[in-house]
Structure formats: structure tokens, C-alpha cells
Amino acid sequence: MGWSGSPLTLPPLRGSPPLPQVERDRTQPQLLAFADAFPSEGRGELRSRERRGEATGRGGLRMTAPTRPLGHLYLVATPRPGQSEAEFLRRVEDALAGGVDTLQLRCKADSGQYGEARPYIALAERLRDLAHARNVPFFVNDRVDVALAAGADGVHLGQNDLPVEWARLMAPGLRVGRSTHRPEDAARALAEAPAYFATGPVHATPTKPGRVAAGLGYVRHIAALRPTLPWYAIGGIDLGNVQAVLDAGATRIAVVRAVLDADDCAAAAHALREALMVNG
């Protein structure tokens, strides 16, 4: 059963310019998916969650209190084409065992089956369980609806995603992270005061094709600001170049391929964690 009510909208933010069309186009499908992901026949499961003592937000959707500490080695877990879900989950679990202490699930609209809300939510719930078993905070990329439905700790938003304030209005129980790519992005992030922000890409990476690398100079710029918010250097970071990133002033890093595509995910995570601890 799909959503059959009137169009879903959010109110304009006081003192804010109108939302650009690209962001309006991205927001409406999220709101529709949010309404469609839990039709009336699914309410019994939501009531079961409540009986189990799981906190819920408005509408019965579970929301997680921000109690799990942000770590220093952040894995952005992205399912690989042709990779089975079991293999993906095994690699993520190994990475957590090796020392990953903050986890994000990133599935974009073109990510095969995970482009749809229900499979995305189901996968997010599996990763949430793996993360929470180790008291690791779990974030969902881009999708506030999926983060809420899956009981994630938070949502990570890019520059073309929802404004942080809108995400807070939709889901006051979620922590919100933000991507930044240049000094003006960082200035906005500091004003928005998200739970954390990411800086990069430090190096060119196939994870973000076509995006010009921000370079180590951007890392130095952020470090010189001495922000009180946690921040992560991200983009093409691996064991071979992590020391230069740390020397530029970063104390936290986010990675994808360096861990998830390694022959031994646990060993790769452990080596990066050791580098962070030595420089901590």
C-alpha cells in the first residue's frame, strides 16, 4: 500500500533563502519513502518494538539517543557491485573487529536493490546490530527516512542533501553529520553545528568520481581553525598516505576502499587504528 495523501512538505526555515530546486527534488522522494516504508500492516512490528523497550519517535519510528561516542576511524561501508550481502556484512564485521569505531552505510539511488527504501532499511538494520554490539555509532548516508526506520544513531548529509536544520526538524533524535569540500562549506558547517563534519576528498577517489581533490591544504586549513566539533579527513586515505594526513593536523579519518576492499579487512582497520593511536 502506497502513500495516498496530500503531498508532503516541510515548512520554510526562518531567515533562510528558498531551497534550491536540486534539494527540493531530493527532499520530496525522501518524504514519500518515509510515509511509504511503514504502511498500516507494519504497525504490529512497531508496537512489538515498543514492548521490547526500544525508544520510538513520532509515528512509532525508533530513534536512538546520542550516547555512543564518535570514534577516530570511520568506515563508510558501500556495497560493491556483484558482492553478496553476506560477504558485505562479513567484511564490515571484520572491519569493526579490527578497530573501526564509527560506521556509516552508504547506498545511493543507483545502488541496485538498495536504491529502494525497504531493502535499504533491512540492510541498515543488519549493520546497526553489528555496530551497536560493539557500542559503535551507526550513521546512514543521505536518507533521514532510512536512518529513522532502521534505528540508526544519525544521518550523514552531503552538500546537496537536506539542510541540517530540516533534518533536525524531521528527526530530532538523530545526530547529523555534514560533508564539506572547501573553506566556505566548513564555515557553514561550523554555523550549523552538526555532530561532526567531514573534510575532503583529500585525494582523488573513485568513490566520488569527477570531484576535484581538496588536498592536504584543506586539512591544514581546518586544523588551523581548531574547531570544537569533531571532524574527519576523508577521500583516498590509506595506510600509505595516512601519516601525511595526520601531519597536516587531522586526528580522525574516514575511509572506504582502504578497509573494505582489503584482503584482510580486520588487519587493514587495525593498521590504520594503530597509526591514529600513535599520533593521538
Curated annotation (Swiss-Prot):
Binding positions (Mg(2+)): D142, D161
Transmembrane helix in keyword set: no
Superkingdom of the source species: Bacteria
Enzymatic reactions: 2-[(2R,5Z)-2-carboxy-4-methylthiazol-5(2H)-ylidene]ethyl phosphate + 4-amino-2-methyl-5-(diphosphooxymethyl)pyrimidine + 2 H(+) = thiamine phosphate + CO2 + diphosphate; 2-(2-carboxy-4-methylthiazol-5-yl)ethyl phosphate + 4-amino-2-methyl-5-(diphosphooxymethyl)pyrimidine + 2 H(+) = thiamine phosphate + CO2 + diphosphate; 4-methyl-5-(2-phosphooxyethyl)-thiazole + 4-amino-2-methyl-5-(diphosphooxymethyl)pyrimidine + H(+) = thiamine phosphate + diphosphate
Gene (UniProt): thiE
Family: Belongs to the thiamine-phosphate synthase family.
Essential cofactor(s): Mg(2+)
Pfam families: TMP-TENI
Positions of region (Disordered): 1-64
Alphabetical keyword list: Magnesium, Metal-binding, Thiamine biosynthesis, Transferase
GO cellular component: cytoplasm
Amino-acid positions noted as binding 4-amino-2-methyl-5-(diphosphooxymethyl)pyrimidine in the UniProt annotation, renumbered to this chain: Q104, L105, R106, C107, K108, N141, S179, K208
Record text on cofactor binding: Binds 1 Mg(2+) ion per subunit.
Basic and acidic residues compositional bias, start-end: 42-55
GO BP annotations listed: thiamine biosynthetic process; thiamine diphosphate biosynthetic process
Residues at which 2-[(2R,5Z)-2-carboxy-4-methylthiazol-5(2H)-ylidene]ethyl phosphate binds: T205, P206, T207, G236
Protein's UniProt keywords contain Lipid biosynthesis: no
Function: Condenses 4-methyl-5-(beta-hydroxyethyl)thiazole monophosphate (THZ-P) and 2-methyl-4-amino-5-hydroxymethyl pyrimidine pyrophosphate (HMP-PP) to form thiamine monophosphate (TMP).
GO molecular function: magnesium ion binding; thiamine-phosphate diphosphorylase activity
InterPro entries for the chain: Aldolase_TIM, ThiamineP_synth_sf, ThiamineP_synth_TenI, TMP_synthase
Matches recorded under NCBIfam families: thiE
Enzyme Commission number: 2.5.1.3
Name of the protein: Thiamine-phosphate synthase
